[in-house]
């Protein structure tokens, strides 16, 4: 899979491989072939699911955190 050359920079060094693995796993679960030939809707569904899972993970890690 080609690297994304967007201006977005990852805040945690070395996390790109884990994100790519998550992307591939979700695409497989959804039956989506990622890439330029896939529809925007199909590619977007994978990106949306990644976001949902990362937010859920962050919320569970923050559970019980108070100021």
UniProtKB/Swiss-Prot annotation:
UniProt-listed PROSITE patterns: SASP_1 (PS00304), SASP_2 (PS00684)
Gene3D superfamilies, per database record: Small, acid-soluble spore protein, alpha/beta type-like (6.10.10.80)
Alphabetized UniProt keyword annotations: DNA-binding, Sporulation
GO annotation terms (biological process): DNA topological change; sporulation resulting in formation of a cellular spore
Note: SASP are degraded in the first minutes of spore germination and provide amino acids for both new protein synthesis and metabolism.
Protein family according to the UniProt entry: Belongs to the alpha/beta-type SASP family.
Functional note: SASP are bound to spore DNA. They are double-stranded DNA-binding proteins that cause DNA to change to an a-like conformation. They protect the DNA backbone from chemical and enzymatic cleavage and are thus involved in dormant spore's high resistance to UV light.
InterPro entries xrefs: SASP_alpha/beta-type, SASP_alpha/beta-type_CS, SASP_DNA-binding, SASP_sf_alpha/beta
Residues under site feature: Cleavage: 25-26
Single annotated GO MF: double-stranded DNA binding
Superkingdom field: Bacteria
Name of the molecule in the record: Small, acid-soluble spore protein 2
